[in-house]
Amino acid sequence: MSEPRFVHLRVHSDYSMIDGLAKTAPLVKKAAALGMPALAITDFTNLCGLVKFYGAGHGAGIKPIVGADFNVQCDLLGDELTHLTVLAANNTGYQNLTLLISKAYQRGYGAAGPIIDRDWLIELNEGLILLSGGRMGDVGRSLLRGNSALVDECVAFYEEHFPDRYFLELIRTGRPDEESYLHAAVELAEARGLPVVATNDVRFIDSSDFDAHEIRVAIHDGFTLDDPKRPRNYSPQQYMRSEEEMCELFADIPEALANTVEIAKRCNVTVRLGEYFLPQFPTGDMSTEDYLVKRAKEGLEERLAFLFPDEEERLKRRPEYDERLETELQVINQMGFPGYFLIVMEFIQWSKDNGVPVGPGRGSGAGSLVAYALKITDLDPLEFDLLFERFLNPERVSMPDFDVDFCMEKRDQVIEHVADMYGRDAVSQIITFGTMAAKAVIRDVGRVLGHPYGFVDRISKLIPPDPGMTLAKAFEAEPQLPEIYEADEEVKALIDMARKLEGVTRNAGKHAGGVVIAPTKITDFAPLYCDEEGKHPVTQFDKSDVEYAGLVKFDFLGLRTLTIINWALEMINKRRAKNGEPPLDIAAIPLDDKKSFDMLQRSETTAVFQLESRGMKDLIKRLQPDCFEDMIALVALFRPGPLQSGMVDNFIDRKHGREEISYPDVQWQHESLKPVLEPTYGIILYQEQVMQIAQVLSGYTLGGADMLRRAMGKKKPEEMAKQRSVFAEGAEKNGINAELAMKIFDLVEKFAGYGFNKSHSAAYALVSYQTLWLKAHYPAEFMAAVMTADMDNTEKVVGLVDECWRMGLKILPPDINSGLYHFHVNDDGEIVYGIGAIKGVGEGPIEAIIEARNKGGYFRELFDLCARTDTKKLNRRVLEKLIMSGAFDRLGPHRAALMNSLGDALKAADQHAKAEAIGQADMFGVLAEEPEQIEQSYASCQPWPEQVVLDGERETLGLYLTGHPINQYLKEIERYVGGVRLKDMHPTERGKVITAAGLVVAARVMVTKRGNRIGICTLDDRSGRLEVMLFTDALDKYQQLLEKDRILIVSGQVSFDDFSGGLKMTAREVMDIDEAREKYARGLAISLTDRQIDDQLLNRLRQSLEPHRSGTIPVHLYYQRADARARLRFGATWRVSPSDRLLNDLRGLIGSEQVELEFD
């Protein structure tokens, strides 16, 4: 093989994020195809792709050279930034490169990105080779300016600190000043004896990728492609040229080519991958192994005392627990993981001791008795048949992985504790990368290409919003996409470009829960990435790479439900303390509570963790779970596999005796499998059951059975053939019929694909049960906590308030004196609306109000509040929202007066603040002392009509709280529905039609699998709710009426809704209130007294009626005197349409009691 003549030493992948188009693997593949012996990837101030690059390089027979490009500043050039490429020659250089990168991020950075000081290179110079940065380096810029003194100073610095390790970089990519710089650099090299090196400053693989790269950069920089201000820093020649092309390009400077090979030979970094390094856990004089044994045995004693309070039963059950504990401890210590368990034990115990709610466990870790004994998990694995080998398999060495759920509010406290315990430089969170996803890349590319918003939006909306959606999947899922792609050249060009950019790394963020703890500094294993302020460090390797690099990942996950449970318990225990009751321990509640299961069987699971979706409620209704094992099964059953395979139907039918229970099949079953499959009525539902079947029938160890389970999941033919043979051989040894064994193997293989991790299912079922129990026993506190968690989502709060009303809970409006930021429960068991849930207010103003209230007591009235609160934080707009929401109802006569007095109150508060500033407290009499003075201080005005009050609540709270728009129609609606309210509805007999009325609170149109359209709306008359279905004919006729907040009168047949357990109506006729009046009203009655009538009133009456003439309803004027009453009927030309506007105008003119519709 001939000696290589060139190696690429400056290449950006997409991990540079500011530029670079290709992923590391394709870059390596291209280099291999070009016959290159080595390749350097030098992303901008990061090694994010290093682990993937290192693995791909060695896999392709290419030496990976570790390096990075930097922005550099030095005093000689002032604020001007220059470029420098740094390569690691050896492991010391790799360490110094890691420190340089980390330091650049930790100092903070601006729009130009992280920057290093050139002086940092003095201390960290060992093992590093520098490429000068070409025309953009400090020497390059000085040469182009002809500043020989500056050139000399720069060169002297590198000669002193990097002798034989500093190369003048030569680039020929057709960009401005490259040739001028190159000639000057060659002259300098000859004059000073400096080596030169050729690079192609690669940004993409092929020259055809240039346009895509330009768009990628424009997306990052926020320009359109045609913008004359857009920087044009790249050329089509920055692709991965072949050795031949580079040799031809630099034929006049052969030493620049030869030096690339020499540098590649000098760069020999070994990155240790695939080993694990844990921090040392403090164990005193004991070994880590012995300390784990000690703590586990002590913990088991406590657990057994709780599980079996009766000593005799405890003695009877102890042997199986002791044996299991011994087995697990042996495996953990043999595999070298005692420290891992102790570390997790410590931060979980610290959390519990410091009021941070922790989940009962999740994932396969719940199968470990050692974890249960150490209080890492809270489920007894023996009681629920959870297997340790599903978590840690001695026959397949891999790190244990506890996913630990913490309360969202306090999770960061735990991470802070870990940082304090092991050292801040030894603890870090993990990076995650955002990529250009299908929907977003269409929008980004469309914007950069200058297409109108509507054009791009139309294409983007055709891409389904499903997680993991790609353009390829979208073309399969949405028929319109290929159609417009073929029909429109502009669409085709946009999508073709989007395909080139899809999946390209766009930005970096923080992994949701991953934390690594190093035995030394994090930077001994991975460089750090920080935010712009130099805070919140994360490793530059993602979660899989950072583990491969030797750091052990701990998952600190935030679970919102734990926060809800915590908030609920705080309110509950506050109440219990007042009543002299001990605090409630949620971990100690019974798992067989009848009240909870009764509520579950009624599908009343709104706000219950994991059980609140429509589909889940349907499953609950069918299954009728009556024990905790059924709840574990619910979590496992509600997945696409079991739902689509018919497994769910079999499970339900077997539970309710409609199908014979067999183990596992009527034709092919074995009695020895009954203990394994009995909890799931003979259905193979869990992965653990797959393992137990292999153990029972064929004598597998549980470790071997876990390998079988994995093989069945991967479905590799050669592996399955091997396992089939092992299974048959084991069954034969156990005396089991060969045909039966193989038939059961086939059944197990079929269901293994649907099997769910029971440990995870059981752990999450426990959290579900805890929320169910709280809802059943402490409904107000639980719902207040749930609404607090959803305060930022008004739509969800509205739905939860509906649920509260359905449950019979009372919700009070927000109150500025008794209210809190969160929803809470008062001493009367009523939920007080959270002030923080008022739209348009924000946390700052509320904090200012509560601070003033805590300092000076309750506010007496509006003027007092404005005077005592910082009006810089509490501006007029915020105060208006608070008034409209009802939060100030106790501060004044009514909302209209409060609103009209707001200007005076703010003015008085301003005067009060000025007076206080010069020591003249209350000089202007702002703070009235007497109630009479307070009343007089408010503007005199009429209260708002109820509808205005309700509209204000709707605007600020998202719902009507103190009233209902239907209230003003109730008397009238009784005429249309025969006095029947929605709460009194019942199923109608076949063929019989009933009429109902209510406010539309939800409306939608859906398309069935057969393509039929169905309209669904929910009516509310404040007594109850009714779901109304409009099938095709009715929908075609009445769809325009299906609008939220409209009053509808609907006639149809009522039946039970199997899904909700409530009632539903199939509509035949739908009317709005105006149409109902036209149909049913016989006249509009206006009653006047002799004292009211004068020419002015009659004139205004005519003006009110005039716009509504040409209707169908006659107008009747009733004239009332002390001694007589007369009726005057207006002529036919004065028939009117009795709209809300007309009725409200007349009632405002004459009086609400004097205007009525007349009916037969």
From Swiss-Prot:
Keyword Cytoplasm: yes
Name of the top EC class for this enzyme: transferase
GO BP terms in the entry: DNA-templated DNA replication; lagging strand elongation; leading strand elongation
Catalytic activity, reaction form: DNA(n) + a 2'-deoxyribonucleoside 5'-triphosphate = DNA(n+1) + diphosphate
Keywords, in A-Z order: Cytoplasm, DNA replication, DNA-binding, DNA-directed DNA polymerase, Nucleotidyltransferase, Transferase
Pfam families, sorted: DNA_pol3_alpha (PF07733), DNA_pol3_finger (PF17657), DNA_pol_IIIA_C (PF20914), HHH_6 (PF14579), PHP (PF02811), tRNA_anti-codon (PF01336)
Transmembrane residue ranges: none
EC number, UniProt record: 2.7.7.7
Family under the similarity heading: Belongs to the DNA polymerase type-C family. DnaE subfamily.
Protein known as: DNA polymerase III subunit alpha
Organism in which the protein naturally occurs: Escherichia coli (strain K12)
The organism's taxonomic lineage, starting at the top: Bacteria, Pseudomonadati, Pseudomonadota, Gammaproteobacteria, Enterobacterales
Gene that encodes the chain: dnaE
